[in-house]
């Protein structure tokens, strides 16, 4: 794993240098060409990361991913959730992420180019701006991923969804797709080191907000969390911070 780690660092440095090509494409070929290049970088990076660590991914409900831009609402188990979702969704996506994530060398640079939106929960005004930016991304054709727990769950547990965490999903008026990630925490978070693991990703049926009553919209976060918890319990696991 030490040798793989060295090779991965070299790979990431090479990926950062490709930012030169991104700048060229954006300036001379336009946003569409630049965005396609970012999508290519994201897919190659996620594939390389998953292969290097030795992650086996089982995907269920791939057919539930809409062709149009949507909001993916997922539990958050590990930093590996990002490459796993890039790989399994296989379409242009951005993340609503803690502002600290966009400061990570190399990764932060490309997350920003991939239309990821930094979120500062301690600043209400900036949080509103972030939501507006996420809505704008969806209108421009980019799906967004939300982690309503606001932080990674310990040992894969599903934490409570933060109050107001689905404001983007509500304002965007786009389809909402519940996503369950199970097992990624074993690839890093549990022992704070990378190691091979098996991951299960489940895409639930899209939720059309226009078909929901006001009461159902209010309870949307709770119902999606319940769906995620039940998907995990199907495997005989009880990874929930609170019983339902």
Predicted regions and their residues:
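Thr-Gly-centered strand-to-loop micro-motif
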Residues: 60, 96-98, 120-121, 148, ...
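Non-catalytic C-terminal accessory region of glycerolipid acyltransferases
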Residues: 2, 128-244
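Membrane-interfacial terminal anchoring regions of lipid-handling membrane enzymes
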Residues: 1-40, 57-65, 218-244
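Catalytic core of membrane glycerolipid acyltransferases/transacylases, capturing the structured
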Residues: 12-29, 38-39, 52, 66-124
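A short, well-structured juxtamembrane/interface segment
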Residues: 44, 48-69
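Hydrophobic alpha-helical segments typical of transmembrane helices
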Residues: 45, 81-84, 97, 106, ...
């Amino acid at each position: 794993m030490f040798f793989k780690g060295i090779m991965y660092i070299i790979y990431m440095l090479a990926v950062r240098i490709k930012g030169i090509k991104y700048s060229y494409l954006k300036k001379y070929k336009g946003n569409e060409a630049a965005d396609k290049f970012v999508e290519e970088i994201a897919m190659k990076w996620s594939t390389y990361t998953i292969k290097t660590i030795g992650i086996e991914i089982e995907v269920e409900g791939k057919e539930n991913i809409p062709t149009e831009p949507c909001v993916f609402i997922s539990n958050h188990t590990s930093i590996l959730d990002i490459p796993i979702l890039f790989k399994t969704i296989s379409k242009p996506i951005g993340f609503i992420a803690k502002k600290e994530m966009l400061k990570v060398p190399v990764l932060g640079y490309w997350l920003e180019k991939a239309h990821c939106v930094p979120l500062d929960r301690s600043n209400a005004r900036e949080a509103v701006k972030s939501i507006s930016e996420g809505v704008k991304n969806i209108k421009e054709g980019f799906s967004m991923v939300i982690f309503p727990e606001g932080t990674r769950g310990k040992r894969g547990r599903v934490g409570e969804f933060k109050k107001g965490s689905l404001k983007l999903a509500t304002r965007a008026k786009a389809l909402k797709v519940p996503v369950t990630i199970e097992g990624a925490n074993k690839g890093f978070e549990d022992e704070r080191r990378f190691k091979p693991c098996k991951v299960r990703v489940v895409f639930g049926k899209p939720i059309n907000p226009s078909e929901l009553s006001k009461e159902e919209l209010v309870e949307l976060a709770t119902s999606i969390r319940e769906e995620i918890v039940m998907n995990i319990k199907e495997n005989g696991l009880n990874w929930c911070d609170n019983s339902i």
